[in-house]
């Protein structure tokens, strides 16, 4: 019997969401671009965790038990991000965390924004974009370092 493939591919998902966000922004679809910048960052953080040994479920997603199976706004809140930093730093991940200094920009990103009117969305797209680009560069570096 062939081994089961894990469908979750956080590095590829992060790149796909980042690329799609760029296309949406270029076509003045700013609310959806902002939403995808958040998903790109979330996937990048989860890739970082998994590369550094975080346990995964059968699909390849972070297990619930350690508190990291959340959306980006919850991953960057102080208590959760401190735990994330401790986990990754204890496994030689400080270099990658240093590459995403603006990740806290997603503290006002919400998965529920997809239901909001455009006028009710926060005006933080430029900050989300900058932070998502940092995550993209971090993923590029990790790939050059042999992370998959």
Label each region the model flagged.
Residues 1-148:
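Terminal alpha-helical segments
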């Amino acid at each position: 019997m062939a081994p089961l493939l894990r469908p979750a591919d956080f590095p590829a998902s992060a790149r796909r969401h980042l690329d799609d966000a760029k296309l949406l922004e270029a076509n003045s679809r700013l609310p959806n671009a902002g939403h995808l910048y958040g998903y790109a960052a979330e996937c990048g953080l989860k890739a970082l965790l998994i590369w550094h040994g975080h346990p995964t479920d059968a699909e390849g997603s972070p297990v619930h038990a350690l508190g990291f199976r959340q959306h980006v706004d919850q991953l960057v809140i102080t208590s959760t991000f401190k735990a994330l930093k401790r986990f990754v730093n204890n496994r030689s991940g400080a270099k990658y965390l240093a590459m995403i200094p603006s990740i806290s920009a997603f503290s006002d990103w919400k998965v529920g924004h997809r239901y909001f009117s455009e006028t009710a969305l926060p005006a933080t797209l430029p900050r989300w974009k900058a932070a998502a680009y940092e995550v993209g560069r971090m993923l590029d570096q990790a790939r050059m370092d042999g992370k998959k």
